[in-house]
Amino acid sequence: MAQVAIITASDSGIGKECALLLAQQGFDIGITWHSDEEGAKDTACEVVSHGVRAEIVQLDLGKLPEGAQALEKLIQRLGRIDVLVNNAGAMTKAPFLDMAFDEWRKIFTVDVDGAFLCSQIAARQMVKQGQGGRIINITSVHEHTPLPDASAYTAAKHALGGLTKAMALELVRHKILVNAVAPGAIATPMNGMDDSDVKPDAEPSIPLRRFGATHEIASLVAWLCSEGANYTTGQSLIVDGGFMLANPQFNPE
């Protein structure tokens, strides 16, 4: 039986690119979508073109714990799970003094509670299978540094980074490796961009002077799912074009 990778929110952007790269590595792919079913179907068609299997399910992490049960159905359809990529997320911006509690909770529900439940479902199945596995949490560069006027998003990504480390320590005995990938400014639909926006000098405030492409995140995820990453767990790997190196003294030329 082929190995199985499930990528949440793989109807577009980083999630879709992860699905395609893992399909190229021979994984059968589980695809989840929240509001873009057509995008999920498009991802599935491209996955199948690589000679592997694709299954689709709607996943609503805004309604928990019931919403996460869709992941169990997807695992049942595919027969197993070897990789989970927690890519689904939500964000909102508002000054801290104006942040409404219900908006705060919406972000934490999806970004933290949803990742916790999906990881727990996946890890329990991996333990049952007895062959280890990989869990990759897509966090953000703002797991490490705050995003102005986005206290909920910043706090949620910090929490997901902490969860990554806690899971890594507890699950290593089951040969389940857990890591985070922390993207910087990536050209995704969530950011109102696509790959056409990845061009030289488009963003001089970033030392590499451009936005990142989705494949530059997905390629790291794919490596974390490979044998080359067998000694890597509990890490948060930043992919940000040098953003974290730029301080107020950084002077783009």
What kind of region is each of these model predictions?
Residues 119, 156, 164:
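Active-site helix of classical SDR
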Residues 140:
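Residue(s) in the substrate-gating loop at a strand-loop-helix junction
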Residues 145, 233-253:
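Short C-terminal tail/terminal secondary-structure segment
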Residues 172, 177, 232-234:
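Short, small/polar-rich loop/turn modules that mediate ligand/substrate recognition or access, typified
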